[in-house]
Amino acid sequence: MRKKWLTGALAAFFISGMIPMTLWADTTDSDELTVTDVTLIDDGETVSENEEETEAAGGYLRTTDDMDVPSLSEEDGSEALLRDAEVPSVYNPKASGFTGGYTLPAVRNQNPYGTCWAFASLASSELSLLRSYQTSEDLSELQLAYFTYHSSTDPLGGTEGDSVSCVSDAYPNYLNLGGNYNFSVVSMMNWIGAADETAVPYSKAAATLSSGLDASYEYSYDVAHLQNYYRINIKTDPQEVKKAIMEYGAVGVSYLDRLLAYSYSTNAYYNNTTSGDGHAVTIVGWDDAFSRTNFGSDSSDQPSADGAWLIRNSWGSDDMSRNGYFWMSYADASLSNAAYVFLAEPADNYDHNYQYDGSILSSNLN
């Protein structure tokens, strides 16, 4: 294919309105961004005496971008391309007889680290590649997580003087610092990955805590690029979210995980509170007729209406899911407003990426 030149990338990389949560940093003389004070991200759900322990790890840090999402208008850009699609009442790629023309990739497992944000971002990217380019990729979550927190100057030198370094003496495990879709978007649009899983396998995660990763893995092993992304308000524009799933395979969302909100007998989740641990997942389907009674035997534990999203998790095949998937009520109170659509392309789409911003956030700086 004829290769092109990518210019003016800086404008797409700005992040604004970050809520001060757990990540704080100081600027140094070399303009390096260093993590200096970090609140621990628990590996599992905080449970009461009536709840069983779970080993599943969370780690999603919500921002205002997750909640403040405008409704779509007729003048919106790429979103408007989805409006002609007819939306069925059921869309389930896991069901036998599914006619969508693709098969979902194998379920991943983030255990035991708080890297759900990387897993959900790359799951959406993998499905985007599958739907748009019929390309099956297993992208490296470890490469994305590591170089999001350990970045250096890009190959063309545009980000010289900018870097991100994780140096918290109180909690040096970058894998449990948490993250969000904004972090993933900025890293991936900087062409930090996405690399193939075979190049930087997740099985080496523990070793990176002491020995790190060779710098060559930051920019030299990419097999896919994040070309664009956008957000849809899943609460006000659920039909547009469904159209995006049909076209691109998945959307990334976050919610607050509570063990008691999950029904093991029906594989259904409904959190009617705004408490729990932040967790990122992908939505790959839906069922408008999924009964509200599946979410609890008591009417007080049930949503007011039928309908559920088909959630792809990253906790392996049997942790609060069946074969890595579960159903979440449309009415879940903890579900973030933003559904993130990742538009990935094969890595040979452009020759160069001219950029000047090597940070991962633009606020929370002391």
Task: List each model region and its residues.
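Predominantly the structural core of cysteine protease catalytic domains
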Residues: A95, P112, W117-E126, A145-D298, ...
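N-terminal secretory signal peptides that target proteins for export/translocation
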Residues: M1-R2
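Structured alpha-helical subdomains that flank or immediately precede key functional sites
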Residues: I19, A25-A199, E247, G252, ...
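Intrinsic disorder/low-structure terminal segments
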Residues: A12-F13, V90, G97, V341
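Sec-dependent N-terminal signal peptides of Gram-positive bacterial secreted proteins and lipoproteins
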Residues: W5-W24
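A generic local structural motif
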Residues: L10, Y102, P238-Q239
